[in-house]
């Protein structure tokens, strides 16, 4: 009987933790996310979007800058012609404070999945016409150090997203030309 109660208690505890998976944020303070960031991990619904340095959506976000109109300027680096190029993406605010419209390759939406503002930001890009087929997310950190607890939180945050999202291995151990 004691084992049954213990098993029931553990099942309830696991169930409570499973329901604590972050969804798209309801609010985002642009002034708090402003500043320098490092791409620590990437994930995609189609791994070919990230599987090589020259893959179309393998970009390294460097900085986020809010504009006076509450839009967001995203400064990133990407592989281009055996080198690295800095790009700027203008992200226009939408009715949702954590979601922005963009025009970058086939992607049209950027959204914040979760952040604590000081240590990490989970940022995703998707194509609204094919949300399960073209979704890329990044675990951004204020430093280049990987926090295993936050990495696990990133994995859990990706689980409810549409499609089968695959994570690219730890980017901090790779010597890629565009990674700073």
UniProtKB/Swiss-Prot annotation:
Q: Which UniProt keywords apply?
A: Disulfide bond, Milk protein, Retinol-binding, Secreted, Signal, Transport
Q: Which gene encodes it?
A: LGB1
Any signal peptide, and if so, which residues? 1-18
> Which Gene Ontology MF annotations are present?
retinol binding
Q: Which cysteines are joined by disulfide bonds?
A: 84-178, 124-137
Family of the protein in this entry: Belongs to the calycin superfamily. Lipocalin family.
Q: What is its main location?
A: secreted
Q: Which organism is it from?
A: Equus caballus
Annotated Gene Ontology cellular component terms: extracellular region
Q: Share what the entry says about its subunit structure, partners included.
A: Monomer.
What is the name attached to this protein's record? Beta-lactoglobulin-1
Q: Where in the cell is it found?
A: Secreted
Write down a Pfam family by its short name. Answer: Lipocalin
Report the Gene3D superfamilies cross-referenced here.
2.40.128.20
Q: What does this protein do?
A: Lactoglobulin is the primary component of whey, it binds retinol and is probably involved in the transport of that molecule.
Could you tell me which CDD domains the record lists for this protein? lipocalin_beta-LG-like
């Amino acid at each position: 009987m004691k084992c049954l109660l213990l098993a029931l208690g553990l099942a309830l505890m696991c169930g409570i933790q499973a329901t604590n998976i972050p969804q798209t944020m309801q609010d985002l303070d642009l002034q708090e996310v402003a500043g320098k960031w490092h791409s620590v991990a990437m994930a995609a619904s189609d791994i070919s979007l990230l599987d090589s340095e020259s893959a179309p959506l393998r970009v390294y976000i460097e900085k986020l800058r809010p504009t006076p109109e509450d839009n967001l300027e995203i400064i990133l680096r990407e592989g281009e012609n055996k080198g690295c190029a800095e790009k700027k993406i203008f992200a226009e605010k939408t009715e949702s404070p954590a979601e922005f419209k963009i025009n970058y390759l086939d992607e049209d939406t950027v959204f914040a999945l979760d952040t604590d503002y000081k240590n990490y930001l989970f940022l995703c890009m998707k194509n609204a016409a094919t949300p399960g087929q073209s979704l890329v997310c990044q675990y951004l950190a204020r430093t280049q150090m990987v926090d295993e607890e936050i990495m696990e939180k990133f994995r859990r945050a990706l689980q409810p997203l549409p499609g089968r999202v695959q994570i690219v291995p730890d980017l901090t151990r790779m010597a890629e030309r565009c990674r700073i």
